[in-house]
C-alpha cells in the first residue's frame, strides 16, 4: 500500500514539475502558441528562428513533425516553405531534419521541451526564382550565419560587398551627420573582422545609396550565389583506403573532396544506386570508357555512426528529388506480401520545379525585419575617406598580394573550398587548385545544373577505393580537351528531367 501511494504521489509530482517547466519555457520564448487540452496530453516544442527569436508551440503528444512545421510557417506567414526545414540534434550529436511523416517524440529524444532550429534546407540554385520578399530575407539571414560561423567562406572583396548590403538593408542610406566609421564595428559579419575590413565596408556602403532593403537583399543573394561553397551540404566520410574524404551534396550532384582538393563530381543522372547499411554508404556510378561503353564504378564510404550514415543517405535522396525531379515519387498503393528490408523513407515535399511554377507572390505582404545584435564599438586608428561615393574605391583599403590577387582574410575552416569554374555543358579541368579563397580569377558558379556527365580530375578513379592523388600526366591537358569535345555533343539542355537518374533508392 505504501509503495502504491509513493508511486502515485511521485507521478503527480513529476507531472507538476513537467507542467512548471513547460510554462517556464513558454514564458522565456518571445511567442507562445498554446494548444487545447490538459498538460498530460501536451508536449512543448521550442523553435529558434533565423532572426534570433524563439517560438514555443504546444502540440498533442502524438503530433507529427508536419504539424509543428505548419504552425511555424503559419506564424511566419511564409508561403515558400519547401526551402526550409526544422533541425535538431540527437544524443550522438548528429544533426537531423525533422521528418514530417513521423511523430515528434519518436524523432527528438531530448525533451520536453523539444528544441529545434528553423534553417534553410535547400539553397535555391537561382535566388531570383524566390518570389516572396520574406523568403529572400530569411535566405539572407541564413547566409549571414553561414559566413559568420565559417561554414561558408568568401574572399575579402565579396565579404565587404555582402556586409555593405547588410548595412544598407538594415540602416538605410549613409548619413554623414549620423554615421561614422566606428559604426561598422558594432556588427559582426565574418569570423575575423579587422579594422581594415570595417573601413572597406564603410566606404562600400556609401556606394549603395538609394537601395531599398528589398533591393539590397536581392543584390546580396545574387552576389552570394557565386561563392564556391554556396548551398553545398558537406559530410565527412572515410573510404576503403582509410583516408578521410568529404561528400558535398549540390543541386547538380555529389562533390568529392580529398582534403581541400575537389577530385570529382558525380552528376545525379550518372548515379544508378545509392544505399546504406549500418555505417557504410555505397555509391554506384556509370561512366563511359575510352571506347564509349558504359562501365560501373562502385565507391564505398564509411561514417563514424550508423545514424550519421542514414542522415547522409536521406539528405542525398532529398537533394536529388528536390532539384532533379518534376514531382516527388509517389508511393505504391499496394503492399508486398514479402517482408521488406531497408528504409521506407521517401521525399514527400514539393520539388524546386513545383515551387517555382506554382507559387505566386502576393500583392502585398508585411513583416518586420529585426535589428542585428550589436557589440561595443572599437576606436578606429585608421581614418575613413570623406570623399563622395562615386569617387571612392574599396581597393584603396584592401591589401593585395604581389601577383595582384586578393589576400584571404579568414582562418580556414574545416570545410574544403572548391575553385570557381566557368559554367557550361563541358567538362571542367581540375588541376592546380588555389589554396586561398578569392585567389581564382573567375567569379562564377562552380557547376552548371545542365551538365549531365561525371566530372573527374587528373587522378585515375579506382572502383574499390579512392587512391591518393598522383602527379598529372604531361599530356593531361590534351586528354581533357579531347574528352571535353566528345562530351559537348552528348549533353542536353534539360533543366528539370523526369524520374530518371537514381534507382534503388
UniProtKB/Swiss-Prot annotation:
The modification Phosphoserine is found at residue 39. It is a peripheral membrane protein. Pfam families: FA (PF08736), FERM_C (PF09380), FERM_M (PF00373), FERM_N (PF09379). InterPro entries: Band_41_domain (IPR019749), Ez/rad/moesin-like (IPR000798), FA (IPR014847), FERM/acyl-CoA-bd_prot_sf (IPR014352), FERM_2 (IPR035963), FERM_central (IPR019748), FERM_CS (IPR019747), FERM_domain (IPR000299). GO terms for molecular function: cytoskeletal protein binding. Residues 29-119 are annotated as: Required for interaction with CRB1. One of its GO terms (biological process) is actomyosin structure organization. Residues 43-327 form the FERM domain. It is found in: Cytoplasm; Cell junction, Adherens junction; Cell membrane; Photoreceptor inner segment. Residues 394-406 have a biased composition (Polar residues). GO terms for cellular component: adherens junction; cytoplasm; cytoskeleton; photoreceptor inner segment; plasma membrane. The keyword Membrane applies. Keywords: Cell junction, Cell membrane, Cytoplasm, Membrane, Phosphoprotein. Residues 357-406 are annotated as: Disordered. The keyword Amino-acid biosynthesis does not apply. Component of a complex composed of PALS1, CRB1 and EPB41L5. Within the complex, interacts (via FERM domain) with PALS1 (via HOOK domain) and with CRB1 (via intracellular domain). Interacts with CRB2 (via intracellular domain). Interacts with CRB3 (via intracellular domain). Plays a role in the formation and organization of tight junctions during the establishment of polarity in epithelial cells. PANTHER family: 4.1 G PROTEIN (PTHR23280), BAND 4.1-LIKE PROTEIN 5 (PTHR23280:SF15). This is Band 4.1-like protein 5. It comes from Canis lupus familiaris (Dog).
